[in-house]
From Swiss-Prot:
Chain's gene name: trpD
Assembly description: Homodimer.
Biological processes, Gene Ontology terms: L-tryptophan biosynthetic process
Residues reported in the UniProt entry to bind anthranilate 1: 79, 110
Name the record gives this protein: Anthranilate phosphoribosyltransferase
Keyword Magnesium: yes
Molecular-function GO term, any one: magnesium ion binding
Family (UniProt): Belongs to the anthranilate phosphoribosyltransferase family.
Note accompanying the cofactor annotation: Binds 2 magnesium ions per monomer.
GO cellular component terms, A-Z: cytosol
Job of this protein: Catalyzes the transfer of the phosphoribosyl group of 5-phosphorylribose-1-pyrophosphate (PRPP) to anthranilate to yield N-(5'-phosphoribosyl)-anthranilate (PRA).
Keywords: Amino-acid biosynthesis, Aromatic amino acid biosynthesis, Glycosyltransferase, Magnesium, Metal-binding, Transferase, Tryptophan biosynthesis
Residues annotated for Mg(2+) 1 binding in this entry: 91, 225
Organism, as annotated: Streptococcus gordonii (strain Challis / ATCC 35105 / BCRC 15272 / CH1 / DL1 / V288)
């Protein structure tokens, strides 16, 4: 371990094999907290490579709890969080729209990072059981086509890393890793990040993790979702190739909405916002959900363009199919 830390101190990259070995030792309890903190800090100071991020994600995913399911076309739309936007639960709300549109949604998420309510908090407020065992979660997914996987329960190996992260108190490679280590073998993914400078590299990691198609998105002002208050940037992974794109609301036929109009509240308040959107009540929350669900349909390949995805999202919500998915999850994941 000392050799690894010394290498990072000299601003030298770790090989995939070196990173794999050190993370394996960490997640099996063989490395001291102080050394883990030094590793995280060294990687941050040097700058994390695609190879290092991929190796970390592959090891962490290998130690995740496995969800038994016959479904092989799962999708997630989890973001990194930490964007300090204090928005409502955009991706969680959009997940029900995507599921209502026929996509098998395995929503991976946690409690709040930068807002008052993370995906786990708002779903708990809606009566969703966060603590079902893996077999039960697999059954929920088979029965409903949507399931929520509480990251804290899915990744027991995180307990070895968390104390070092907390002691550092700064963003590290781990902040970028959560959406990459989904317990299932996802086919497609929409991943939000507050770091527009990492769109392409994150798409490369998703490619290395086996995604067939994906969109990595960063909204205006560092929002880790698509936004209607400025230019949204995204990387598209398609047919093994990665391309960079951006759009303004007017480019996709939508009106600009200020960030202040989509502020959220606590878990109970955000649950009420989620319900209002799924019940098709006109609001900035509805428009923002439609945008992100539309981008999700495009990321999945269900639509051929973002505009087509937006139209599909409106149709799914208006039909009641998205709200029906929430009711199914409340019935089966309880």
């Amino acid at each position: 371990m000392k050799e690894i830390i010394a290498k990072l101190a000299d601003f030298k990259d770790l090989s995939s094999a070196e990173m794999t070995d050190v993370i394996e030792r960490i997640v099996t309890g063989q490395v001291a907290e102080s050394q883990i903190a030094a590793l995280l800090l060294g990687l941050k100071m040097k700058g994390e490579t695609i190879e290092e991020r991929t190796a970390l994600a592959q090891v962490m995913r290998g130690h995740a709890k496995q969800i038994p399911t016959t479904i092989r076309t799962a999708m997630d739309n989890c973001g990194t969080g930490g964007d300090k936007s204090f928005s409502f639960n955009i991706s969680t709300t959009a997940a029900f729209v995507l599921a209502g549109g026929g996509i098998k949604m395995a929503k991976h998420g946690n409690r709040s990072i930068s807002s008052k309510s993370g995906s786990a908090d708002v779903l708990e407020a809606l009566g969703i059981n966060l603590d079902l065992d893996a077999t039960s979660l697999g059954k929920v997914f088979e029965q409903t086509g949507i399931v929520f996987l509480f990251a804290k329960n899915m990744h027991p190996a995180m307990k070895y890393i968390m104390p070092a992260r907390l002691s550092l108190g700064i963003p590290t490679i781990m902040n970028l890793t959560g959406p990459l280590i989904h317990p299932m073998n996802l086919e497609t993914q929409l991943l939000g990040t507050s770091r527009p400078d990492m769109l392409e590299s994150t798409a490369e990691v998703l490619k290395n993790m086996g995604r067939k198609r994906a969109v990595v998105v960063s909204g205006p002002d560092g929002l880790d979702e698509a936004g209607l208050h400025g230019r949204t940037q995204y990387a598209l992974l398609e047919n093994g190739q990665i391309s960079l794109h951006s759009f303004l609301p007017s480019d996709i036929g939508m009106k600009e909405i200020p960030l202040e109009a989509i502020r959220g509240g606590n878990a109970k308040e955000n649950a009420e916002i989620l319900l209002s959107v799924l019940q098709n009540q006109a609001s900035p929350y509805l428009e923002t959900t439609v945008l992100n669900a539309g981008l999700g349909f495009y990321a999945n390949g269900k639509s051929d363009s973002i505009e087509e995805g937006i139209a599909l999202a409106r149709q799914v919500i208006a039909s009641g199919a998205a709200y029906e998915k929430l009711k199914q999850l409340q019935e089966y994941q309880k």
